[in-house]
Amino acid sequence: MTSTPSFRPPLRLWPGIVLAVLLVCFQLAIPVLGPAGPPLRFLGGLVGGLLILLWWLFFSRTPWSERIGAIALMAVAMLVTSRFLHISIADAGQGPLFPILAIPAASVALVAWAVATAGLSERLRRASLIATILVACSAWILLRTGGITGDGRVELHWRWTPSPEDRLLQLAAKPGTPAAAPTKSDAPAPASEPTAPVDRPAVDSRAETPATRNPASAATPKEPHVTLAEWPGFRGPARDGVVRGVRIATEWETSPPVQMWRRPVGPGWSSIAVHGDRLYTQEQRGGDEVVASYSLRKGDPIWQHRDAARFWEPTGGAGPRGTPTLSNGRVYTFGATGILNALDARTGAVVWSRNPVTDTGAEDPGWGFTSSPLVVNDIVIVAASGRLAAYDAVTGERRWIGPEGGAGYSSPHLMTIDGVPQVLLMRGARTTSVSPADGTLLWEHRWAPSASIVQPALASNGDILIVAGDAMSGLGMRRITVRRGAGAWTIEERWTSRGLKPFYNDFVVHKGHAFGFDGSILACIDLADGSRKWKGGRYGHGQMVLLPEQDLLLVVSEEGEIALVNATPDRFTEVARFKAIEGKTWNHPVLVGDVLLVRNGEEMAAFRLSRAAH
């Protein structure tokens, strides 16, 4: 009787190869999917990885010991690895980042192993299988993230490399480095009363010793002298991203922008406010949330105000999200943890400080508090997530709290509709309007659940343009007509369009058209009916301002490039482009006269633009 060797069918590799190729191609194609790209990148990667594991377990024809052993080893390796991850991967507040990254990577590595070792002996195959799984799962210990791009790509760096913030702190700690000796608060202000600015002196950073400190007055705040800032805050004087009265030369090949200065700054997505030779912004410096003033001409630091607070989340990283607001000689700022400050614009001295989060009972919305303060007459208004809070601009006394509503990340927006001044806020599934005098609800329009990030805008006839949607739905834009009736406000929907679907990138309105980002691509729609006129130009998830006298968009890309694009409906035309700053750039650009200011979470720079010949 002769024994016959056991027959082992060949491995069925083609399904695994197909799934792995599709997974990789899907990840590469994400940028063309628009606003839905970021969540689909994570969801698609996870689903693709799990499908590969199902192939391996039930259809690969490998020995059952290898199938089950590989899955078990992968689970154990990921569990052990999770204990040693960098916090930026381990503490992904918006979701389980590590398995979302590790499962697709380990699954593709498994397919690559199966293909590469098909002709090896059983002993070598199993040894290399163990090594492949351990490396694919444990390699994440060596990495950290620098956040996530607008299309959902995780920015990976070696764990031991310093972040831009680390390098900035190391630079500031060097002897002889000029830096402002800051004012400082050890805790957020209580909700009951404004804090007295007694022990929080402002310091001129150009001084060489602490002896030059300018202490804040403990006296009752006085009404400041009325002045108008050139760029008083978020998206300009009207919060519409429009630069009026400025014409620039567009032949950048012959007259390129000239760099005035460049300097490192702390992380944060704050934009810049400008008055005279002073600019103001917010940034994170280690454990302190900082309001900083710099020279517009030279970029030198003038003063810093510090609060002992730090906000961080894995998508956008650390730092404040809101932009300072300038009004009557004061700087109003709202930090990512919810601290509202009124500072003297000249010295940085604290006038008063409040905590609207405590006052409203708002919960952390996840990506931090992002509102930029709005000053209307004698009150300053902020949005603590989806609820408005108003304070006396001089004393900090609480004036009113707005109606409750869904969470959101937009800022209060002043509009005059049918002759009535009102403050609009995008929040959750609704757009609400309140009276700036007392916070009384005037009207409300419901649409669909939304991340509520983008600011509303006015059409030429007074209609309102609003945006709804999130990274998955990308619902688009809607035009509504709001009128004051005999006893109530009436709201009529004119159209809803998917031709322009901004997610967190604000749009501008010009000559009957809206221009903005549809995902990572610029688009133009006709405001008469919402139809798309063109779509073109890939700038990532950037921002823009409009120069209406020249029919021109000044676009800052997510990669820190500046581009000039014609704001005309006939076709997409890029006029010029240059690289301005390094790093992921989500901050709004500022153009004051012929000075262009751009910043991100790593650096800030100023450029002189040539004036156009009239």
Give the ranges of each region predicted by the language model.
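Aromatic (tryptophan-biased) beta-strands that constitute blades/sheets of beta-rich domains
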Residues: 159-196, 200, 205, 211-264, ...
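Extracytoplasmic beta-rich repeat domains
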Residues: 254-256, 260-275, 288, 304-325, ...
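Blade-level signature of beta-propeller repeat domains, shared across WD40, Kelch, NHL, RCC1
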Residues: 560, 584-614
